[in-house]
Amino acid sequence: MKNTLIASIVATLIAGASFAEGTISGEVSLDFAEANDKIGGTMGLDLGVDVSGMATVDLDFSATDGNAVTLDNWTVGTQVGALGVAFGDDNGVMPGAEGEQTLAAPAMTESLAVTTGAVTVALGFTDWTTDITDISNVQGAYTLGVAGLDVTAAADYNLDSENTVLGAGVGGLDLGVAALGGAMTYDVDAEVFGFETVATRGGLTAYLNGDDTNLLQNVGGEYEMDVAGATFAAGANYDVDAEDLTPTASLSFNF
């Protein structure tokens, strides 16, 4: 019964794609980062295929200089009344932030996600190419508005390890001088509470994070601006414990 249900949902997603219209977008970027006390650069190409309509298709391709184009993420979905269904490898619902060095990040590879209203539930597969009945983990999230804030509560349960990770995200707090948000996670088995606070103003984004055993571990930020049709971004992360500053910079062109 479970095999038939999952196979039927996937077939519906594929069939619905023929009724949609798509667009292709791309970005060429020059990225620079510090490693081993030296600054190195790479040229990257990102291509996106987005289809919307009765069905949705999202394909994200990337390549670097001298390497083949690879498919990084893909999602195929459809909407049936108030019910949204998506199948792909980009359906994780745990809250994220900017640095994310101290947040628990349960793996979610290929998965089947069902959304209705503000609720999303995703079933992750161990290896969908060999057995679509082998479920590795289950994630769920609920988003609501509270006093002008966007609040998300989420959880991940791993069926193999029987571990649970709880998560929460908050955004939309306008302080006038900046907008404030953040995320937090709690790993039940590890008994670790991680958090990150993010502030944004215009093209500037700053963050700090830590956990309940070490409150301040990383401080970082990035500034992004338009330069003659291109986007320039410069940022850095400072590891407080290692006393290590890691700068980054990029110049990207969208088409």
Indicate where each model-derived feature is located.
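Outer-membrane beta-barrel proteins
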Residues: M1-F255
